[in-house]
Amino acid sequence: MTTTDAPGHTLTTDPRPHFRSAARTACATVEAVSVDQLHLPTPCTDFDVRALLGHLVAVFRRVTSVAAGVPAVGHAPLVTDVPDDGWGAAARAAVRQLEQAWADPDVLRREMVLPFGTLPGAAALASYTGEVLTHTWDLATATGQIPAWDDEVVAGALVAVRRKLPTAERPPGIPFADAVPVPDDAPAIDRLVAWQGRDPHWRPVA
């Protein structure tokens, strides 16, 4: 079953397949990062590559916790207890636990407390799909990777985040800057990360 949000875009009522796809792309990107890249800057200006890896794993763990009814507010933004060569395994393990936590369809109907408001589980997971994709783009761009984005998943995430985030003057608790203008015909991933406050043309300083 699907619901139409805008012409040409649909949102599935069960966001778990899209989240799984985003998580797989994230894990593949994490596993391709080498130890000598951990110090590099990223488009997410608060984090270098090592910190961004810690944040991604923390996001996966947070999404697991909210499924169990734990408010997302107050969770540590970074995981710091992973060895430099262990990020791929840590990400995979976190995603396995997350998928188990969300296996019951009833979780999609539960109210969940997020930093930016209280949402049903389905809407919360759709929003987190956009966050995972954006941070995967951050990581890939910082380390010279070009992931195989699933345009349907990216477009669905863009619909979800546009529902939740205004273009500018974003409220407290939103971890993204104001939207960056991009052409309407830009690639789906560019439109998503731009809405999340990223410059799609960002590249590391040579």
What role is predicted for each listed range?
Residues 55-56:
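Glycine-rich loop at the start of a catalytic domain that most often binds anionic cofactors/ligands
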